[in-house]
Amino acid sequence: MATLSLHSHSFLLVLLPFILILRQNLAVAGGCQVPPVIFNFGDSNSDTGGLVAGLGYSIGLPNGRSFFQRSTGRLSDGRLVIDFLCQSLNTSLLNPYLDSLVGSKFQNGANFAIVGSSTLPRYVPFALNIQLMQFLHFKSRALELASISDPLKEMMIGESGFRNALYMIDIGQNDIADSFSKGLSYSRVVKLIPNVISEIKSAIKILYDEGGRKFWVHNTGPLGCLPQKLSMVHSKGFDKHGCLATYNAAAKLFNEGLDHMCRDLRTELKEANIVYVDIYAIKYDLIANSNNYGFEKPLMACCGYGGPPYNYNVNITCGNGGSKSCDEGSRFISWDGIHYTETANAIVAMKVLSMQHSTPPTPFHFFCGG
């Protein structure tokens, strides 16, 4: 017992500086006098309950155990990066667009992200193109209701709200990861990347034509470091930190293309503010320097089945019968083999808010409403 207490004390000493920095960033950015409107498009990295609302899919405890003390449809033990970013702007956590039970709680925007989403094929739920069409319907309906009923005007987002909103895009991971899972070779996966980039570019241009001017684009993380991938791929092609080199190489190529796309769009869309965020660098740093952050076994899931080295079994995933979760998720980077723990998400958010990984460097409170 004494050993456990000492270990916990040491861990808190390691983590405390990051918690304090995050709180400081939240306080500075949280000075928004007018909370912003935010629209998010993405996959499970930023899904705040869309899959549950849209398909009735059950995501139960232990998901959500550390912050919400209940399952919210998020694939984590607590908050996601997008939740911390919303809190930094002093706005409510985003509700899923498909959640019909939240009443008028779309005044600060909506979240179109859904678990498993990709950019291609375009018309398969819930691809980026489908999410975009949902947004266009949402906008049309909101403006219609605001125009015909005075009582509803206070609850609806108006033209200025859509024009000044922040449009966040975090998608592409599944396009790459699923291609590998289907048995495609590295060269074939790489050939798909330009098409994925093209879909994201098209979405931004459509949003721009609809009046959007503020865009926040996340690249994809180190796919080769996910316990899920590591447990399912029999390969000797590991990098020095134990990650799958080919998966990470493909992710880097995708990120390079996404960066170039953002640079091109800044030239093409003269009035747009487009911020590119290097999530890959942030997340890989957590893996490479896990001890500095107080994490144990950086390539092992907290919740899953099978034990070391990865604690992931595709037939017994987190939350399903037979799976087990660790006592302290704060000591793990990976929650369920694919998604991050709240502690890891908090550190990622802190580093995002630092502007050190953003191009161009932009304080997040730039997106305050007004």
From Swiss-Prot:
CC per GO annotation: chloroplast stroma; extracellular region
Gene Ontology biological-process entries: lipid catabolic process
Compartment(s): Secreted
Single GO term (MF): hydrolase activity, acting on ester bonds
Keyword terms of this UniProt record: Glycoprotein, Hydrolase, Lipid degradation, Lipid metabolism, Secreted, Signal
Residues annotated as signal peptide: 1-27
Glycosylation: residue positions: N90, N315
Alphabetized CDD domains for the sequence: SGNH_plant_lipase_like
Pfam families with a match to the protein in the record: Lipase_GDSL (PF00657)
Enzyme Commission number: 3.1.1.-
Active site: S44 (nucleophile), D336, H339
This protein's record includes keyword Transferase: no
Family per similarity comment: Belongs to the 'GDSL' lipolytic enzyme family.
Name of the featured protein: GDSL esterase/lipase At1g09390
